[in-house]
Amino acid sequence: MEIIHKISTNKRLVTFIYFLSLVLYSQDNSKSDFYREDQFYFGSSYFIQTESIENFKQNGFSGNFQLGFIRDIPINSSSTNALGIGFGFERNYFTSNIQPTEKDNNLNYEIIVSRFLESKNKISFSSISIPIEYRWRKSTLSEYKFWRIYSGFKIKKNFPLYSNPSYGSELRIKDIEDWTTSIYLNAGYNTWNISLEYDLNPILKNKKISNQTDLNISFFRLGLIFYFL
């Protein structure tokens, strides 16, 4: 009886080890499909003013360039769906007929109607951005060229504007909103991707031009963004 008991115990032990090995194998096998798409990115966009401002004209090229890094957090076993959070830098500039002027340490804004002057009035500013996004891609562990759709929002810390007016010296504008947000959609194949972004806040703090029209400067951005592993 003792021998039979030992044989039975050994069988149970072998069976337990067998099933344990199957579980461990399946876990290792599932882990083999798990990967991250941590990426550096670089992009450039063209600005289109979204708010209607009387007599406002956008002249020349207005846009930005951006660069940064996205940390990938897969949310399914095949890693085709993920969340992303990143850190980036943006340099923005736009040319228009908005003319800031300084008098007694106060800044005033007006619309310049002269065709000659308006094309020379460039305003620029920089931002630190925190993109948070949902990421879908048609990729595998060994496939590096695939379709992707990344959509989310950005929180931006903005730094003072600088204006190169049509006449006079450069002006430092402190009226910029310190924090703004935007929503975006990036989609494409492999390295090349279309980038769409829409500002949810105006850039300037509750400013008006000389005729008391609200100076709500916000943009729709259309451009390209490139991802690198």
Can you say where each PLM-predicted feature lies in the sequence?
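Short loop/turn motifs that connect adjacent beta-strands in outer-membrane beta-barrel proteins
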Residues: 28-38, 74-81, 139-147
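Outer-membrane beta-barrel transmembrane domain signature
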Residues: 73-75, 119-205
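Predominantly the C-terminal beta-signal and adjacent terminal strand-loop region
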Residues: 31, 35, 49, 174-229
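Bacterial Sec-dependent N-terminal signal peptides
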Residues: 1-34, 224, 228-229
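Glycine- and aromatic-enriched membrane insertion/assembly motifs of diderm outer-membrane
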Residues: 48, 57-115
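Outer-membrane beta-barrel translocator domains and adjoining extracellular loop/strand segments
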Residues: 53-57, 95-102, 161-168, 205-211
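Short glycine/proline- and aromatic-enriched beta-strand/turn motifs that initiate or cap beta-hairpins
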Residues: 26-72, 225-229
